[in-house]
């Protein structure tokens, strides 16, 4: 149907827009590829990041209209709120602050997502923990009770073939446990989790 076609297309637009968000913030101007490649291509040229942002905004506005809400899709699929959230980030890049406020307010007031206030999940009876602790347990992340999840990566804890990917709350640095792998220019260990450890350059 036209509805399912647009939902699928909107999900693909989200994935592309997410990748271009990361690329343009890391590298600036990059090649913009909008058509399927069927043979090798080597004559790429860059497109200004501002032009890319405008294209991604247009795509995400389409996606935000056509991708279903989280309660209407299977876990792991792109959701309407995820599209709106990424669209808000693009609006901020463009200085369109009122549009960013409008679209994030739609998520907040949309009735699907709300802040978790009640304990839930596999260890909700552990007395010295709270709802934040519950939300970041590996086995709780994709439960329906976790109403704060806009887009979930499904990685079933304890099942064959799973990875530790959903254990990570936020990556801000290279993994400090790789002692001896990351080196400073003079060859010293470049990462440490020791308290007050100074790393000489």
Language-model features, listed with the residues they occupy:
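Aromatic-anchored glycine-rich loop motif in surface-exposed flexible loops
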Residues: 1-78, 94-99, 109
